[in-house]
Amino acid sequence: QLQVEDDDKIGLYSYKVQSTITSRLANTMIQAKMVNNAKRSQHIVFDVQVPKGAFIDNFTMDVNGISFTSKIREKSEARKMYSQAKAKGKAAGIVRSNALDMENFKTEVNVPPGTRIQFELHYHEMIRRKLSSYEHVISVKPGRLAKHMEVDVRIIEPQGLRYVHVPNSFGDHFDGITTISKGEKKAHVSFKPTMAQQRKCPTCSSTAVDGNFVVQYDVNRETTGGELEIFNGYFIHFFAPENLDPLPKNILFVIDVSGSMWGLKMKQTIEAMKAILSELRAADQFSLIDFNHNVRCWRDNLVSATPAQVEDAKKYIQTIHPNGGTNINEALLRATFILNEAQNLGMLDPNSVSMIVLVSDGDPTVGELKLTTIQKNVKQSIKDEFSLFCLGIGFDVDYDFLQRIATDNRGMAQRIFGNQETSAQMKNFYNQVSTPLLKKIQFNYPQESVSDVTQSSFHNYFGGSEIVVAGKVDTENLQHLESIVTATAANAELVMETLRDVEELDGFMKKDRYADPDFTRKLWAYLTVNQMLAERNTAPTAALKRNITKSILQMSLDHHIVTPFTAMLIENAEKDEIMLADQPKDPRRGCCPGTLGLTPNAPNNNKGIPAWANVTAVPVSFMPEQRSPPVSSLSINR
């Protein structure tokens, strides 16, 4: 979004977005070129929305040929340099990410008449698979008509593309303007509306381009054990098996019915819950808990999801009337008690998956109020036996707490905006976790050949998602990399093997001028930093937290990315004008569920399985791979 004092006198002569996805790694550049045609100085705001979780890695600015470039520094060092520049009377400004969701990069510049200015922001992210699709979302909000407008997205996927789809997110106004060119492993998406096409109406001076440009796609999957991609000393293992029977699930819905849920939020929650209950499978077991200052159970134990029980649960949900306070601690402990009791009594299928889904819109006001104590109580009660998923409705809830408690218990959290879309958002989240296909997934690699492997042990795999593991690999002394994945399916203990030539991708990558030759390193760093951020969030001691912080800082500096512990200094060549870009201290960012780090290898006696593979159960089904070879403000007065 470009904001100025006098809209009519600022010309936007170019607004360009270029994004290249190489094996799920999206590098995005947003560039705006403007000129101040007014007879006085103008205040220009460059405000760009960046996807939550993306890493900003570069920002440059050019003002009448004067270039400003960026570098990453440790946060306190960067702030010190910024303060020194400001104290000496040098031009200085602050660029801050939005403290709420970390989604905005914003700089404000005061430019004299006739000035030409160019902003350019670069960031990268890993595109995660949800509901059987990768969705790349780019915020395109130029704020005004642009003489040249372009959104250009290229997709390079060595696995091959199943489909590419661009929903009409800007509305019918832009029907037929987006072009899609799709090959076997590459695709090109282009959106180039003329100035006339950008107008809201033929005589309007405002732009209709205001929203998210979305590209959806999926890749081909020929192997059960996943896809290994090896390049430039790193490997990435993409794992998304299909055509498996769902595991039965034992699910407890814990719903906040305190007074703050009154009105639209409760109405939408009831609507969502009725739809979710209808989707339970016959093999599932479930119950409902609603809580305010008191805790009530629809059933004191799990019941089978028969049509009669589901219908009765819907009627119960319909009778809820929000009032009173919020006793989160008691509600979660009651839920864990029901699941633990069912397990102790042998009522749960050994191959089933147990989970709690908490829906709340506020902090505790009754019972235990200390968040760290609630987190400790829930952790001790769950005992790593099942998963906790948290939905935080609106902005009064402490979303950071929900993320900590979910991550600590093999789950994840999501913010739900308390509006007319609440029901759809809740159903969308449930659909992501409604179909567990595997449990106890363990990735194994030869220890003498790999190092610095990211999280390799996962509690569950849900249909439509994808598990990604990365690490460093010694390609100098290795011709092939082998992986063995073990997991529990509905009817078998699986052992899945994958073997890849370490040079298999070399030719493909060198032939494509758009592919990022650094994609494996960036994906490994992205996963590693996010994993450490999650690990730090739940670190039990201050000493461990400090050590993790040091590691995150070093990774951030090594890979030139803005994280909670680094800042971006933006300055001109003479170093007499400086800006500081940083993030708030505590990021509200979720990460990787499950155990962090490599699980120590256990001895195994399975014939045909390498000694380094951590296979503790005798395989019922051995599935080898089947594959044919192949700124507050910055004032500039010049």
Where are these regions (language model features)?
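VWA/integrin I-like adhesion module and closely mimicked acidic/polar interface patches used
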Residues: 362-408, 412-416, 421-428
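An acidic, Ser/Thr-enriched
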Residues: 58-101, 110-111, 120-254, 420, ...
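Exported/extracytosolic protein signature
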Residues: 25-28, 37-44, 56-58
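Short, solvent-exposed beta-strand/turn "edge" segments of beta-rich domains on protein surfaces
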Residues: 17-27, 34-36, 109-116, 459-462
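Short, solvent-exposed loop/turn segments enriched in Ser/Thr/Gly
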Residues: 26-30, 353, 481, 549
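N-terminal, polar/Ser/Thr-rich
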Residues: 1-24, 614
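Von Willebrand factor
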Residues: 243-304, 329-336, 348-360, 364, ...
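Asparagine-centered strand-capping/turn motif at beta-strand->loop junctions
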Residues: 33-40, 48-50
